[in-house]
Amino acid sequence: MKQGIHPKYEEVTANCSCGNVIKIRSTVGHDLNLDVCGECHPFYTGKQRDVATGGRVDRFNKRFSVPGAKK
C-alpha cells in the first residue's frame, strides 16, 4: 500500500438513543449518534407491527365499486 494516501482508521464510539454504546472502527474520526441500533430496532426486538391495511386492488375496488352491485 502507498503511504500517506489512505484515510486514518480510528476507533469511534456510536451512541444510540436507547443508551447502547458501541465501539466501532471508522474513517469518520468523531463519535456518532444513532437513532436506532440492534438492541432497540423493532425488527430485532420483535415489537414490529403489521402495516398490511389493504393493497392497491382493494383501494381500486373501494373507489370504483357500484352501490347495489352483487359480488
Swiss-Prot record:
Tagged with keyword DNA damage: no
Chain segments annotated as transmembrane: none
GO biological process, one term: translation
Cofactor: binding details: Binds 1 zinc ion per subunit.
One Pfam family named in its UniProt record: Ribosomal_L31
Cofactors, names only: Zn(2+)
SUPFAM superfamilies noted in UniProt: L28p-like
Keywords: Metal-binding, Ribonucleoprotein, Ribosomal protein, RNA-binding, rRNA-binding, Zinc
Record GO cellular component, one term: ribosome
Gene Ontology MF annotations: metal ion binding; rRNA binding; structural constituent of ribosome
Binding annotation for Zn(2+): 16, 18, 37, 40
Family per similarity comment: Belongs to the bacterial ribosomal protein bL31 family. Type A subfamily.
PANTHER family: 50S RIBOSOMAL PROTEIN L31, CHLOROPLASTIC, LARGE RIBOSOMAL SUBUNIT PROTEIN BL31A
Quaternary data: Part of the 50S ribosomal subunit.
Function: Binds the 23S rRNA.
Protein name: Large ribosomal subunit protein bL31
Species this protein is from: Serratia proteamaculans (strain 568)
